[in-house]
Amino acid sequence: MIRFAHVSVLNLENAMRGARNPLASWDKSDSFYDEQGNYVLGENDLNLAVRLAKAGSDHRKFIRQIFVSVDITAPLYWWKEFDTYKVGTVANSTSTMHKIHAKPITAEDFSVDHLTLESAKFFGLIIDYLESVRLEYMETKDKALWYELIQLLPSSYNQMRT
């Protein structure tokens, strides 16, 4: 399970204006803001953006001026793959370290949609055990139990990052 929320695309207007700087073709820009305040990319600007994007990295540098922000909730194993491909990104994540004990550990906290029936039953035992460790930690505040939670947490545990 991967969930996307709160998507924002920012600085499109400035990026398109910058894309027109080399030929001083600002007068050909046809993008505008609609009544709701949304930036609408005009046909001329879209055509320019597509041509520059296809022309190679030297010509598509305007794309690097477009910022995208999104909340992504995904399992830890997915984040390991994602981290391999990201460039020039900054992320703030929910803290497993600080919050793993703050709420009950349930199956809904994990992405396990490809388990066999047998594996799903075993996974239920893992969840039950982790929850029992969490409850004991909440009673005793024994740091060894906290480490046990962190170290036994399956990589299918979902984490949100912005």
Task: Map each language-model feature to its residues.
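Family-specific signature for flavin-dependent thymidylate synthase
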Residues: 1-162
